[in-house]
Amino acid sequence: MFDGLFDFLQNILLPIKWVIEQILVFFHTLLGFLGFGDKSGLSWALSIVGLVIVIRATLIPVFLKQIRAQRKMLEIAPEVRRIQEKYKGKRDVLSRQSMNQEMMEIYRVRGANPLSSCLPIVLQMPVFFGLYQVIESAQNAGTGVGPLNGPLGMDFRDSRIFGVVPLHDSFSHDFYALQAGQAFNLITMIVAGVLTAIMIAVQLFTQLKVIPKNIPENAKNTSVYKNQKVMLYLLPIMFLGMGFSFPVGILIYWTASNVWSAVQQAVAIYRNPSPGSLAFELRRKRLGVQNKKTKGQRQQPVNKRRAKRR
């Protein structure tokens, strides 16, 4: 049963892995023209960053849809809270069904979809697993399903960041080697730790400084906002697990993707904030200052004779 499921997932990821390899090789070739060596670990690391740029740029329309969905959820949050208060303490099946029906009706009328905000993450997961398998395949056999084959696949496998950190190495691999008294790569552990720290710092900055500015005051007591605060504590724990377990190449991808998300959120909130939020008021002040400068009445020059008569 599990073998069949594994083969099914492998078949789904096959075209994704092929596309990932094409993008990696494209950026690796481009960086080669710019003076990076064929076996340079930095070249392959930057190629992974290039993969992030391509994937996230492709998902910009989905991100904009996510922003609209989040805004809709915040707009209807007071109505959802009223329904929850209406059925508070009622645990019978009929009451729960009635509550769900009323909430679904609000979602339908207002055009909101609670699942739309998860779409960018869901669409990135196949790329994440595809890249993981590309790195694993390169480590085990030096062969891929696309252009990462033959000598190029060997170069990808043998590349080292700073000359010592393989893309397929992980913190956990060297940590267990250290515990067993075997040879381990301290630089890999340091690089993995730094990348994990950057991931957590960027995520905390986004959750604490960027997103709260875009939440209206009347929505801060809703379950939607409380769920976001829960994620504030869960995501760093998840990132710690990722930093411990996943290869350095995956950590590069996820760190670059987190930085992209933070910048994208900040730009979207700056240009199109939610009504009633702090970011919205700041934008109004910015526009008000600009309007005062541009809409001021032009004073006509007065010649000397007219000035003397006055």
Swiss-Prot record:
Chain segments annotated as transmembrane: 16-36, 44-64, 115-135, 186-206, 232-252
Keywords, comma-separated and alphabetical: Cell membrane, Chaperone, Membrane, Protein transport, Transmembrane, Transmembrane helix, Transport
Cellular component aspect of the GO annotation: plasma membrane
Membrane topology: Multi-pass membrane protein
Any one of the GO BP annotations: protein insertion into membrane
Keyword Transmembrane in annotation: yes
Entry annotated with the keyword Electron transport: no
Subcellular location(s) of the protein: Cell membrane
Start and end residues of each stretch annotated as Disordered: 290-310
Molecular function as annotated in GO: membrane insertase activity
InterPro entries given in the database record: YidC/ALB3/OXA1/COX18, YidC/Oxa/ALB_C, YidC_ALB_C
CDD domains, sorted: 5TM_YidC_Alb3
Entry's family note: Belongs to the OXA1/ALB3/YidC family. Type 1 subfamily.
Subunit structure: Interacts with the Sec translocase complex via SecD. Specifically interacts with transmembrane segments of nascent integral membrane proteins during membrane integration.
Role, per record: Required for the insertion and/or proper folding and/or complex formation of integral membrane proteins into the membrane. Involved in integration of membrane proteins that insert both dependently and independently of the Sec translocase complex, as well as at least some lipoproteins. Aids folding of multispanning membrane proteins.
Protein name, per record: Membrane protein insertase YidC
Organism listed in the record: Tropheryma whipplei (strain Twist)
